[in-house]
């Protein structure tokens, strides 16, 4: 059926993983507040759909991490790219808000540019870590680049990209409460040793990270018989996706919580957290943590050749030094995970030093109001 143009303003939004979905949803709320009647279509997760996005495809179909993981999904991903291009040509949105996911969104931006549709890109690609030459491509296809890390804006100087640091969306969050308050909110016993495990929002991350996390939990329980383990289930996942892994540890007390990652980490004495946005989300709760990640051997080999940074964890990058342990690939073993968590549980000086450094990271994220500033940028380019 042919699309019938609406009298209201309409924009295109594309967001992939859970954090991008959350940031985009908050921006859409601000856009609707500033411009009543504004509508949006595109690709998003549950939070964007709840905010009113007309989803032409779910975020889960384009949110894939790692070269080996992407290859079998290429036909579907390219199909969505073509479908969005056709929808944009037909509907002629007044602007596009593309959030993160550079390998997909920069290709889409090139198509939108040919259609004369202004593009606002939210969450800069990590050109400071690898493929700095992408800045030239960005300059050709993006009208406004909105950065969420304080050091990113300067990497665009002299490239022709109109970039602005808008503050980090997580700066909206109030200072964390006590572990006991979060345990009470989650229905957890207040006096027990509590360990959070954050395995990620993608099936591939669950497959690689949850089994060694659960093995580490078994080791920690042996040293702390009162220990309870809590896992937030990302909005992009179903609880059933975790069941096969939990089935191998029936005697281990693992509490699943839908979403609410910050509360789960806030309830913890220490946390195992997958690398990515989750590390910053967890770090803002000012709880000791260990960062872990595993890629396929092929994806990791390619990453080692291309990525030139000293640290992987976002909190370490922002701090400019290693403030939290990073366990990658073979080092992300149950033995190492359990040993690092045990150190944080037992060494008061190590705990306090890490928490003090995380306070510095929290202070570096800018002032609250990022969703409003992004919404204003989108309205500023609308035709």
UniProtKB/Swiss-Prot annotation:
Catalysed reaction per UniProt?
a lipid X + a UDP-2-N,3-O-bis[(3R)-3-hydroxyacyl]-alpha-D-glucosamine = a lipid A disaccharide + UDP + H(+)
Gene name of this polypeptide: lpxB
Asked if the keyword Lipid metabolism belongs to this entry, the reply reads yes
Name of protein: Lipid-A-disaccharide synthase
The EC designation for this entry is 2.4.1.182
A GO CC annotation given for this chain: membrane
An example of a GO molecular function for this protein is: lipid-A-disaccharide synthase activity
The pathway it acts in is: Bacterial outer membrane biogenesis; LPS lipid A biosynthesis
Which family is it part of?
Belongs to the LpxB family.
